[in-house]
Amino acid sequence: MVMRSWPAPTVVALPDHGGPLSVHDTVTGSRRTITPGATARMYVCGITPYDAAHLGHAFTYLTFDLVNRVWRDAGHTVDYVQNITDIDDPLLERAAATGQDWQELAAREIQVFREDMAALRILPPRAFLGVVESMDLIADFVARLRAQGVTYEVDGDIYFSAADAPGFGSLSQLDRTAMLELFAERGGDPGRAGKKDPLDWLLWRAERPGEPAWDTPLGRGRPGWHVECSAISVHELGMGFDLNGGGDDLIFPHHEMGAAEACCATGSRPQARHYLHVAMVGLDGEKMSKSRGNLVFVSQLRKAGTDPMAIRLALLAHHYRTAWEWTDADLRTAEQRLERWRAAAAVENAPDARPLLARVRSALADDLDTATALAAVDEWADAALSGSGDDPDAPALMRTTVDTLLGVALDR
């Protein structure tokens, strides 16, 4: 199955340009200003297509949509790549448990994801690549690692030797005990017999009875999780791209191990110049996750008649680095805000919106400070609705500011 992205919303250029984006870099643990060239390159890890897309997914992809929008407003072209993990153990397990064909399950969930992203006005990636369609390039990447002497086999499976990765652990800054604990929790196999080190991870899984497998020079099998993203990112963006990101549960092992693979395969570093990770969204006191089953789905909210722009505004009310819990009150507040903004955008004369544009630009450039950006729009809307201001061009500039930078369409 060849992946296709979703339709791109129209993005109207604003007067002048915004400034550079400063974010909290996971590797340094500090604020850093990202300084791309003419083209900003970004890779974001995609979903495993079952139970998609819940609000945790939406919050993550909204965050990187803001990065995309800020970069574009600053005058950059953005080369954005995202994968889809359309073959993986959890997908196969869900298909078996529900009596579905795994390919049909994946195709259905990917289509729902596309529809949700389009409804939320998330700018689509230039390349939206599934693992299945990328099988040859992933197998070639594993072969490159094997040629570098950093792999070994256990019963036909190919493993990466963590001891052969220079600087392993520098991304996550975790000690060995914490690494082993998270590796076991997040899809690793530290207890497998025959491994040289419990932290060594799977690159290629040899064919098992009853499991899908592909013919490659490595033999029949399928890739491990981490190498899928490292292979696709290197193929599409090269090394040293500007930003690698995802949820903060990907810091270790996924991004740590993927970076080690990319650096060893290419002989260069870093894989990415900056790493940005998004906090988790909770429900009923726990992280929203597939394993817990405590999910709120974008598609369900949409089917219930919720305006996708209200969903987007509810997510925008929270900062990407702060974990939070979804409540019905979040949505009610967002719906009220959306109505107020739409009413303000419809007045004939309003206060000058150029200061509003400057404030929203400044807030987003400052580590994606969405709360400050929303407050600035609220203040302008309140003034406009009170009859203040006599600028007939202001409502149009306000609408474009909110649409282009925050991704919120105020047309009904």
From Swiss-Prot:
Binds 1 zinc ion per subunit. A motif ('HIGH' region) lies at residues 47-57. Keywords: ATP-binding, Ligase, Metal-binding, Nucleotide-binding, Zinc. Its cofactor is Zn(2+). Signal peptide: none annotated. A motif ('ERGGDP' region) lies at residues 185-190. InterPro entries: Cys-tRNA/MSH_ligase, Mycothiol_ligase_MshC, Rossmann-like_a/b/a_fold, tRNA-synt_1_cat_dom. One of its GO terms (molecular function) is cysteine-tRNA ligase activity. GO terms for cellular component: cytosol. Its EC number is 6.3.1.13. A motif ('KMSKS' region) lies at residues 287-291. The keyword Transmembrane helix does not apply. Zn(2+) binds at residues 45, 229, 254. Belongs to the class-I aminoacyl-tRNA synthetase family. MshC subfamily. Monomer. Catalyzes the ATP-dependent condensation of GlcN-Ins and L-cysteine to form L-Cys-GlcN-Ins. This is L-cysteine:1D-myo-inositol 2-amino-2-deoxy-alpha-D-glucopyranoside ligase. It comes from Thermobifida fusca (strain YX). The gene is mshC.
